[in-house]
Amino acid sequence: LEEQSFSFTKFSTDQQNLILQAHY
């Protein structure tokens, strides 16, 4: 369960990074 949560958090972070990269 913790691994899933970690993966989900990493996924969200990756998504935010993509949005930031696309913004610049």
Swiss-Prot record:
Q: Which UniProt keywords apply?
A: Lectin
Question: A GO molecular-function term, please?
Answer: carbohydrate binding
In which domain of life is the source organism classified?
Eukaryota
Per the record, the similarity remark reads:
Belongs to the leguminous lectin family.
Subunit comment for this entry? Homotetramer.
**Its function?**
Agglutinates erythrocytes of blood group A. Binds in decreasing order of affinity: N-acetyl-D-galactosamine, D-galactose, and D-galactosamine.
Protein name (Swiss-Prot/TrEMBL): Lectin
From which source organism is this entry?
Answer: Crotalaria pallida (Smooth rattlebox)
